[in-house]
């Protein structure tokens, strides 16, 4: 995200950081102490509070569960889905228990992946396959899509 913003000469904004700042807690603490429903509302409110067109915005993956948030993002600009195959996602996710991943009780990562995939595709204006990309390659593809 930040590398793409630099290529595009745009600002960069991370909604996870906004949520943490508003709540005064790390994402995982919010989920553990206040629950998934509370976190979902906080995430939706954070996204709906944004009025920053012309900015590269990185969201958490669970924002896709909020139609209102996704439509708001689409009104501000292009929604670009950075696609990873399931196996690649598993390799890249570190510290699952502490990184603030919204995972419903009883769900596996594969359940989450299968549930979110059609939602990501529904809201995406563009899809970039990132499995074999470096950060720089992905940023260049984001920049091409965003222009």
Which role does the model predict for each range below?
Residues 2, 68-71, 91-95, 140-141:
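Short amphipathic alpha-helical segments
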Residues 7, 91, 117-147:
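NTP-dependent small-molecule kinase module
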């Amino acid at each position: 995200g930040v590398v793409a913003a630099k290529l595009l000469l745009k600002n960069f904004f991370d909604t996870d950081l906004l949520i943490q700042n508003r709540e005064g807690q790390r994402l995982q603490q919010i989920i553990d102490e206040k629950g998934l429903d509370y976190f979902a509302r906080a995430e939706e409110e954070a996204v709906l509070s944004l009025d920053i067109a012309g900015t590269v915005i990185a969201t958490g993956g669970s924002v896709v569960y909020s139609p209102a948030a996704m439509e708001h993002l689409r009104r501000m600009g292009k929604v670009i889905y950075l696609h990873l195959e399931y196996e690649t996602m598993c390799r890249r996710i570190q510290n699952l228990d502490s990184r603030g991943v919204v995972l419903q009780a009883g769900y596996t990562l594969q359940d989450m992946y299968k549930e979110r995939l059609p939602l990501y595709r529904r809201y995406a204006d563009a899809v970039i396959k990132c499995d074999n990309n470096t950060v720089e390659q992905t940023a260049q593809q984001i920049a091409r899509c965003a222009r």
